[in-house]
């Protein structure tokens, strides 16, 4: 069964061309310098409509489906994982707004998300609250006309460039209530190279890979947000509201993994045809042929599972199980494929002369962020043991 139509493939061709012309020529150099995605690239992505793939036309989006969204993420990530990731936060915020936002919040933010002028970042994780997000302690205290936010957040990716932060905070001070006392807020700020906000301090976290989008530790001190920044105008619903975004976020993450895996496979395949040892191309040696075969199997299995989960969501069905499976499979596949690609290149795979080492470093993060593989397995197990 094919989940991808000719229209999907036509869209893929356009994104592939964009990636080859705009992303691939600059990715390795910027990665090596640990520099961020140039804003010119963000602007060009916006002009192509990539930020608005899932949003309705009434909000200046393209009104397309989740399969298209996964294809865009996949093709951009083939060039550089971080470029394919820029859209993830928009997908999360847009999903939150469409499901739970007030009419005013939708009108205020969704058109900007669709056109790339609103660049969000997610401030959910805390130093002592990772997978156990219900244990977070950041406070949102009611005050005249709004709330004061106080506390710390961690691993807030793209916090510097973002002009709005999605912040999950505790509106009920009783921590024993766990997820029942959390609320979602939108905190507006200036987009800059560093964190620019009078009451928010932040420092970037050095990372092994996933360069192009810096992740930050943030400290909030009496950050005032007006009442209309509370998602849906409802307190203590933030955890439940956030759950609606998990499916799309995990689909998009699985697609990013497939993109990185495809890039590594393509490079290793071409190298194996050109590199000669023992008087013939190494692709003619059985050991290398077996590696290439296994890599292809894992790649297509991850891709098709991702498309299948996306097709379920497009049909209006829940796909939290399938999206979780797709993310787990894609995370495993990208680690395996990038590792094997390095092995096929031998010493050159460990060299910064070729991009395979970048694929390897970038691919490793997939099993950690957007819900660890261990958490995904818990979700899967609960579903099958009902």
Identify the role of each PLM range.
Residues 86, 113, 128-131, 155-158, ...:
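Short Gly/Pro-enriched turn/cap motifs at secondary-structure boundaries
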